[in-house]
Design a protein with these regions (language model features):
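HDAC/HDAC-like amidohydrolase catalytic core signature
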Residues: 1-124
Length: 124
């Protein structure tokens, strides 16, 4: 496979977004993907890009400001849930989420600017 038109984002910032071993979106999934990709040689045939954080203005384009503030507060407290019981809060979830959102926005932006053909953000 030789496809430099595909960019894969990975970095430890994205790996911080996860909800523990018991949750389907555990923090170990990104590291497992990276190990498998390197093992298969995928990292040598695509462009690798670093994660990027978004700002609060980006977040409130989708979420109500009160919810963004609540997530930031829950991130400091480090417990409770961000929704009806499926998304646990943990210390640092706000900043981890900013990297997930910012990376997705950066990938879309680069594609729309015709710098890349495809991008892959392995987080969900």
């Amino acid at each position: 496979m030789n496809n430099k038109h595909l960019t894969i984002y990975w970095g430890e910032e994205l790996g911080r977004y996860g909800f523990g071993e018991e949750h389907p979106l555990g923090q170990d999934r990104l590291a497992a993907f990276r190990v498998a990709a390197i093992s298969a040689g995928i990292d040598r045939s695509v462009e690798i890009a670093a994660p990027m954080a978004c700002n609060v203005t980006d977040l409130i384009l989708f979420h109500e400001p009160a919810y963004v503030q609540r997530v930031e507060e829950q991130s400091t407290i480090g417990r409770g849930y961000l929704d009806c019981g499926d998304t646990p809060a943990y210390p640092g979830i706000y900043d981890a989420g900013r990297f997930v959102v910012g990376t997705g926005l950066a990938a879309i932006s680069r594609i729309m600017e015709h710098n890349w053909h495809r991008a892959f953000v392995r987080i969900g």
